[in-house]
Each structure stands twice: as structure tokens, then as C-alpha cells.
Amino acid sequence: MTVEQKELGRADILEIMKLLPHRYPFLLVDRIIDIDGDNAAIGIKNVTANEPQFTGHFPEQPIMPGVLLIEGMAQTAGAICARKAGTAGDLVYFMTIDNARFRKPVVPGDRVEFHVTKQKQRGNVWKFHCDAKVDGALVAEADIGAMIVNKEAQ
């Protein structure tokens, strides 16, 4: 990633892999755009038919499991937290899910945008509102909580 991209508030997959411990098949954010400091960001997930969840969910009519949409939201929020923490010894733990709603199915070929906005932060605890959108239409939403912990202190 170039310096210009960082100044514009973007993270490519290599930068995301530095921020998050997740790896295939559980890294659910391909790119992050429009990062506004620690206030908001948009994570991008390109949904493809060859992803392992579609083998069983559902073979005749593949639909992205809602829990994976929530996880994509949480990973986008986690990247915001990790950027703010800036310490290699820190991990971001997903703590809470509230008000989760699933509006429309997400299928292979869709490009999901995880719109994540910080609602509040107190110490190492963060609260976010998250919307998942496909082609501008709301497909899922949730309020999530996260906590930054030092992995050495566990």
C-alpha cells in the first residue's frame, strides 16, 4: 500500500492482514475504504461461489449465512480498533451483538459493503453501529461491541 492510500484512509488485503489475525477461510473483508480515523469505515467483501460455506448453505440456492455478515461487520470494526491501538501485542475481541436484523439474502456475485460507525468508546471498549449493503440496499444491520486486549496479559 502506498503512502497516498493510507492518507486517503484505505486498507488493502495486506494491510488488513497486519491488523487482523483472521485468515482464509475466515477473513471476510477484502478491502477497507473511506476510513475516517477511528470513527467510521467501509469494509468490502466480494462474495464468490467457491467459498466453503456455500457447500452446505445451501447447495441448490447458495445464501451467505447471516452470522458471516455479522462477522464481516465485526472484522471491519476490529480493523478500526486495531489501527487505533497500533500495538502488535493487542487483539480485538468481539463482545456483543445487539439489534441484529437480516433484510435480504446475500448471494454469490454480490459485493457487500460493511458500513461501520463508532457510537462510543470508553477505554478499551468500543460500540459500533453496522449496516451491510449490496448495491446500496440494506441487507443486514447490527450494533456490536468490541474490546482491545493485550494478548500477553491474558
From Swiss-Prot:
- Entry keyword set: Cytoplasm, Lipid A biosynthesis, Lipid biosynthesis, Lipid metabolism, Lyase
Q: Does the keyword Nucleotidyltransferase apply?
A: no
Please write the reaction equations for the catalytic activity of this protein.
a (3R)-hydroxyacyl-[ACP] = a (2E)-enoyl-[ACP] + H2O
Where does it reside?
Answer: Cytoplasm
Q: Which Pfam families match?
A: FabA
Enzyme's top EC category: lyase
Provide the E.C. number(s) assigned to this enzyme.
4.2.1.59
**Record's family?**
Belongs to the thioester dehydratase family. FabZ subfamily.
Task: Name the HAMAP family on file.
Answer: FabZ (MF_00406)
Name by which UniProt lists this protein? 3-hydroxyacyl-[acyl-carrier-protein] dehydratase FabZ
Task: Please tell me the species this chain comes from.
Answer: Allorhizobium ampelinum (strain ATCC BAA-846 / DSM 112012 / S4) (Agrobacterium vitis (strain S4))
